[in-house]
Amino acid sequence: MRHVKRKSLVLGWKYIISHKIISGYIWLYRNCTTNIYTVCKFLRCGYICEELCNGRSTCDDRTFAHRTFVFMGVYLQLIHHISRFRTNIAFITQ
């Protein structure tokens, strides 16, 4: 019973985190691909928009999607290398 409760709690947190990531992506998409860049800049995501729009303040859907996938690939590789490094350190210190 206790194991089931903990598992459902972990799944609940995973759902909340994934929901926040997806809603944040949709929010960035709406702000970076439309002409309300001033709102995005005011809310301090202007730098992210410029990175995802390849140096421009606004961009079309295709550019935004392509740059997002590039950044996500780099981010996932970084997480993979960090987790491998932590595993190696844990193995060495045992």
UniProtKB/Swiss-Prot annotation:
Note: Partially overlaps YJL016W/YJL017W.
Entry protein name: Putative uncharacterized protein YJL015C
Organism, as annotated: Saccharomyces cerevisiae (strain ATCC 204508 / S288c)
Classification of source organism: Eukaryota, Fungi, Dikarya, Ascomycota, Saccharomycotina
